Amino acid sequence: MAIVKDFLYNNLKHNIEAGKMQYGVALETTSAEVAEVLATTDYDWLFIDAEHGPHNIQTILNVARAIAPYEMTPVVRVGEAAAGTFKQLMDSGIQNIIVPMVESGEEAAQIIRWAKYPAEGKRGMGAGVVRASRFGRIPDYQQRIDDESMIMLQIESLKGMENLDAIASTKGVGAIFLGPADLAVDMGLGPNILHPDVVAKMEYAIKRIREFGVPVGTIAATPEQAKHYADLGVSFFALGADTAFLASAADSTVTSFKAELEK
């Protein structure tokens, strides 16, 4: 049976490398139907949040299958980093993984070892029988996957900021994702990502990471803040979430009808 699509080609990675801004949306629920609805929009990538959402490997795989016919690229943020986590996700065909709360160069190096095949890493070999290689039908899977995958390390604490250089300079890091909400909390400011002190930390981090030639992603509270960070070098954003959209639309609808009917 012929393979009619290059399943390994990583749209998100190549578009970032080509200088095309990439817009992402978070999936906090485990619904494959909601994921497919989001895949019909103009968002470029789906932020499958297995850190704060109740995802497991099966729900992640169901979501990835649901959006596979579309141009949207799946990105999984794991709850915690471990060798087994990387094997399961990557063998299931997930090529873009965000690891939260990375705080040192040593942590960064260990994560990359879990994600890469020897000699660059220690990822176990099971490619011949798993979805990632389309069950052995992509003969050059092992040769290509390390170049096509993108492992993103999330810096979101004061300690992570202190060790930014060591993290960003780690060989094999695909991108750095900055988490201003946790950073703000760590600074004693609550989740206020618009606070001037948080913005100053973010500005420094973005410019410094770009000096290492590493792509930077983050979230933004407003279009104006996103534009400011993009001007500094951010090339991909996570903007909004399925649960927030649903709550906002529900509130707006019932409020408008109540306002008219209860005059």
From Swiss-Prot:
The keyword Lyase is annotated on this UniProt entry = yes
Question: What would be one Pfam family of this protein?
Answer: HpcH_HpaI
Cofactor(s) in the UniProt record: a divalent metal cation
Please list the reactions this protein catalyses: D-glyceraldehyde + 3-hydroxypyruvate = 2-dehydro-D-gluconate; D-glyceraldehyde + 3-hydroxypyruvate = 2-dehydro-D-galactonate; 2-dehydro-3-deoxy-D-gluconate = D-glyceraldehyde + pyruvate; D-glyceraldehyde + pyruvate = 2-dehydro-3-deoxy-L-galactonate
Residue positions binding a divalent metal cation: E156, D182
Q: Which UniProt keywords apply?
A: Lyase, Metal-binding, Pyruvate
GO cellular component labels: cytoplasm
Active site residues of this protein: H52 (proton acceptor)
At what residues does the UniProt record annotate the site feature described as Transition state stabilizer? R77
Matches recorded under SUPFAM superfamilies? Phosphoenolpyruvate/pyruvate domain
- Extract the GO molecular function terms from the UniProt entry: aldehyde-lyase activity; metal ion binding
Q: List the disulfide bonds.
A: none
Enzyme nomenclature, EC number: 4.1.2.-
Where does the entry annotate site (Increases basicity of active site His)?
D91
Name the PANTHER family for this protein: 2-KETO-3-DEOXY-L-RHAMNONATE ALDOLASE, PHOSPHOENOLPYRUVATE CARBOXYLASE FAMILY PROTEIN
Biological role: Aldolase which can catalyze in vitro the aldolisation reaction between hydroxypyruvate (HPA) or pyruvate (PA) and D-glyceraldehyde (D-GA). The condensation of hydroxypyruvate and D-glyceraldehyde produces 2-dehydro-D-gluconate as the major product and 2-dehydro-D-galactonate. The condensation of pyruvate and D-glyceraldehyde produces 2-dehydro-3-deoxy-D-gluconate as the major product and 2-dehydro-3-deoxy-L-galactonate.
User: Family assignment?
Assistant: Belongs to the HpcH/HpaI aldolase family.
Q: What is this protein called?
A: Hydroxypyruvate/pyruvate aldolase
User: Which organism does this sequence originate in?
Assistant: Actinobacillus pleuropneumoniae
